[in-house]
UniProtKB/Swiss-Prot annotation:
Source organism per UniProt: Arabidopsis thaliana (Mouse-ear cress)
Superkingdom of this protein's organism: Eukaryota
Pfam family, one: Sulfotransfer_1
Family statement: Belongs to the sulfotransferase 1 family.
Tissues expressed in: Expressed in leaves.
GO terms under cellular component: cytoplasm
Keyword presence, Ribosomal protein: no
Gene Ontology BP, a term: response to jasmonic acid
Matching SUPFAM superfamilies: P-loop containing nucleoside triphosphate hydrolases
Record-given protein name: Cytosolic sulfotransferase 15
Major enzyme class: transferase
Source organism phylogeny: Eukaryota, Viridiplantae, Streptophyta, Embryophyta, Tracheophyta
EC number per UniProt: 2.8.2.39
Active site per UniProt: 168 (proton acceptor)
Length: 359
């Protein structure tokens, strides 16, 4: 995939930290102003907008804000606003959507390899395949963490078709930008129990130094109240689930557990949805199996690029790969927590037809 060039939106208004310092100077105070990393580069105008939003304790930053009906960080809101204002979809665009820690890295690797298998043969691949030198997040960039981060407006004109992007946005906040005919959305979700445990581990690994670690019980309470990045998780899942039932040609819904159970069958389904089905000859040559093995959690985790490099917002790639298992939650949740989350899932997802395998 070609690398897009970036240009920043000029900031005519001083940063929030500078505004705050000016206010203190007017009051005759000259001490240094404590400043969190998440406030860097935010304008006074933007900070005023943030101050008007409901907020809760964050997982890896001080706060999460309720924006467009979901919870996210300040810098994410800045990027989302730029994306929604400037992104222009094209026919044949592919958008991969997930809630955090539900198999995003795996989905990116699988989709990239399916779409580019005629350029990079997975059967004959040695170290020349892009996955050996690039993390999947570099091959399929996020709207909110890469392309439009910090309010940037990227030039996407040089990207080869089909352009492939990723997002954690709920469907309601993505819908208007992907309505053009031919744009396809692939959604991957994971059972809420494992998603929670994976999120808790990951956020404590990458949290800001100014934020204390979130304890398991604290995180669990926030999660059950819907306060997690891009949550509530049930609304995120149901948004894509219902759209996939309404428009299966537009939105393809996958479960992490189904991929673990039968990766090859689901790869065939995914390729067909992307209008690049595997031929009989490809199946005889073992292309489907080769893609599954190349993109497997075990293989990706052992690659040097995923051990030492950084991709998303300078977070170390190694934190993206922990266990990749189903039912790891049994090692962490108490009986009362299992009961609470089970009741919540039944209440929020009951009657929708959306169910999960937990073990």
């Amino acid at each position: 995939m070609a690398t897009s060039s970036m240009k920043s939106i000029p900031m005519a208004i001083p940063s929030f930290s500078m505004c705050h310092k000016l206010e203190l100077l007017k009051e005759g105070k000259t001490r240094d102003v404590p400043k969190a990393e998440e406030d860097e580069g935010l304008s006074c105008e933007f900070q005023e907008m943030l101050d008007s939003l409901p907020k809760e304790r964050g997982w890896r930053t001080r706060y999460l804000y309720l924006f467009q009906g979901f919870w996210c960080q300040a810098k994410e809101i800045q990027a989302i606003m730029s994306f929604q204002k400037h992104f222009q979809s094209l026919e044949n665009d592919v958008v991969l959507a997930t809630i955090p820690k539900s198999g995003t890295t795996w989905l990116k690797a699988l989709t990239f390899t399916i779409l580019n298998r005629h350029r990079f043969d997975p059967v004959a691949s040695s170290t020349n395949h892009p996955l050996f030198t690039s993390n999947p997040h570099d091959l399929v960039p996020f709207f909110e963490y890469k392309l439009y981060a910090n309010g940037d407006v990227p030039d996407l004109s040089g990207l080869a078709s089909p352009r492939t992007f990723a997002t954690h946005l709920p469907f309601g906040s993505l819908k208007e930008t992907i309505e053009k005919p031919g744009v396809k959305v692939v959604y991957l979700c994971r059972n809420p129990f494992d998603t929670f445990i994976s999120s808790w581990h990951y956020t404590n690994n990458i949290k800001s130094e100014s934020v204390s670690p979130v304890l398991l019980d604290q995180a669990f309470d926030l999660y059950c109240r819907g306060v997690i990045g891009f949550g509530p998780f049930w609304e995120h899942m149901l948004g894509y689930w219902r759209e996939s039932l309404k428009r299966p040609e537009k939105v393809f819904f996958l479960r992490y557990e189904d991929l673990k159970d039968d990766i090859e069958t689901n790869l065939k389904r995914l390729a067909t949805f992307l209008e690049l089905p595997f031929t009989e000859e490809e199946e005889r040559k073992g292309v489907v199996k080769a893609i599954a093995e190349l993109c497997s959690f075990e293989n990706l985790k052992k690659l040097e690029v995923n051990k030492s490099n950084k991709s998303i917002k300078n977070f170390e790639n190694r934190f993206l790969f922990r266990k990749g298992e189903v039912s790891d939650w049994v090692n962490y949740l108490s009986p009362s927590q299992v009961e609470r989350l089970s009741a919540l899932v039944d209440d929020k997802l009951g009657g929708s037809g959306l169910t999960f395998r937990l073990s």
